[in-house]
Amino acid sequence: MKRTIIALACVALAGPALAQSLGEKTGVNSALGVAPSTADFVKQVAISDMFEIESSKLAQQKGNAQEKSFAQQMVTDHNKTSTELKGLVNDSKVQATLPTALDSSHQSKLDKLKSATGKDFSSDYNSYQVSAHEEAVSLFERYAKGGDNAALKDWAGKTLPALKHHLDMAKNLGKAPSVGQSK
């Protein structure tokens, strides 16, 4: 009887911790506007930065002129945010573990980009950039409003304008100006 009660107590207490990670992973937190846990935020930001950098390095090789220009800025800016995030974690201002590799979802997108060429590459790269930046803006907005680590919350708020600018730029990839129009 005691073992059953102890087991049930462990399951009940583990629920909220598991729910936060599961909620972020499944998009439930985003849909509800709930701030991610610090560990989830750090993990998602690090993976997003790795994907942005690696996919944009491919775009620098395979993309059109507009994509190459955008990709250069993505590599520069996301290297900067990666360095800043690592600094926060390494300075012990944030208690979290940085991932060292992409998750399976981002890795499969990167693999698809590696094998794509021409218009297929452009279509996939442009689409991935929009969705990645929409997710990043949501993630940073939610953490900046409701995150539980002051240093990371402040950093998220300061980084958000650049991510919104990236999203606007990504939405314009592949949209050439009409005749007589300048961009």
Residue ranges and their predicted role:
Residues 2-6, 18-183:
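His/Met- and acidic-residue-enriched segments that coordinate or traffic transition-metal cofactors
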Residues 9, 14-16:
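N-terminal signal peptide c-region/cleavage motif recognized by signal peptidases
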